[in-house]
Amino acid sequence: MHGESPIKRRESRKIWVGNVPVGGDAPIAVQSMTNSDTNDVAATVAQINRLEAAGVDIVRVSVPDMDAAEAFGKIKQLVKVPLVADIHFDYKIALRVAELGVDCLRINPGNIGREDRVRAVVDAARDRGIPIRIGVNAGSLEKDLQKKYGEPTPAALVESALRHVEHLERLNFQDFKVSVKASDVFMAVEAYRLLAKEIVQPLHLGITEAGGLRSGTVKSAVGLGMLLAEGIGDTIRISLAADPVEEVKVGYDILKSLHLRSRGINFIACPSCSRQNFDVVKTMNELEGRLEDLLVPLDVAVIGCVVNGPGEAKEAHIGLTGGTPNLIYIDGKPSQKLTNDNLVDELEKLIREKAAEKVEADAAVIARG
């Protein structure tokens, strides 16, 4: 069950957002965005720290005005994770956060203003080694493209993106990534497919304004899953009307399902039925809650009966198959029997022991060079 992904990723140029590589042979980076008031430095720092604990690679922060820019500078000094400043309309805000140490600028060159203003932002980014994200969104296409196409379409999104790409290239700036987001899954997927054929820069994937926790997760998993399975995408952000930490969890779950990133437990569990020999749903809920802190990648199967249990358990690092008593498999081999008494406690202990063993084994491999 565990192993290399069969996906051949699209070749792209590598850029760096702080100390995080994006594109090329780098792992697909997981992003999120704060939803606190940026001027509330303490609240925003606390949220970023929670995101970092959840495993986020990069965090975007909205910077709508100069007061927020000054707050951003304070926030930057208090966190470790790379920060992207989300900026629209006022190019002076971009110049200020560049001075304050931003790791990436998210701009739309089309709404920054005149050529000299875009040039000033690009020069500031180049001088400080700051990459830029061109962020095209179906909800804010240029008026001439709205008139030309009548409505947002994949072709309109791509034309907008290429217009901005050419703009940066005219200024001899190549250190950028691009997104073409829409809330419609088919529109976003087709736009990314078209854009992937046109440029070599890394692609930032997302289904914008996807919805709440459940609906947004489904739409993002469908849309991003299609693209990632085709090898398209270098960094992802799951847009949810929910706690931003959930965006990180969903992002990793999507990548884990495609074997593109490994972090924490990959649970394989049956939906349960009347054949179950223990309460699968309760067991899973307890295990997921208890093991959130575990970052070691492990496959754990929790199957309620012997129909599919042995087969699934043999493919996992640790597998539990319901029976009388229940049977534990470790690395594909029967290991021990457990009754329903203290089942979760015993299983948690075995998983943590296996995780520690894996850490030790990996360290030994590294030590041997």
From Swiss-Prot:
Top-level class of the enzyme under EC nomenclature: oxidoreductase
Gene Ontology BP terms: isopentenyl diphosphate biosynthetic process, methylerythritol 4-phosphate pathway; terpenoid biosynthetic process
Segments passing through the bilayer: none
Residue numbers binding [4Fe-4S] cluster: 270, 273, 305, 312
Keyword vocabulary terms for this entry: 4Fe-4S, Iron, Iron-sulfur, Isoprene biosynthesis, Metal-binding, Oxidoreductase
One Pfam family matching this protein: GcpE
Co-factor(s): [4Fe-4S] cluster
Catalytic activity: (2E)-4-hydroxy-3-methylbut-2-enyl diphosphate + oxidized [flavodoxin] + H2O + 2 H(+) = 2-C-methyl-D-erythritol 2,4-cyclic diphosphate + reduced [flavodoxin]
Superkingdom of source: Bacteria
Coiled-coil spans in chain: none
Pathway involvement of the protein, from the record: Isoprenoid biosynthesis; isopentenyl diphosphate biosynthesis via DXP pathway; isopentenyl diphosphate from 1-deoxy-D-xylulose 5-phosphate: step 5/6
Family in the record: Belongs to the IspG family.
General function of this protein: Converts 2C-methyl-D-erythritol 2,4-cyclodiphosphate (ME-2,4cPP) into 1-hydroxy-2-methyl-2-(E)-butenyl 4-diphosphate.
Protein name per the record: 4-hydroxy-3-methylbut-2-en-1-yl diphosphate synthase (flavodoxin)
Organism: Pseudomonas fluorescens (strain Pf0-1)
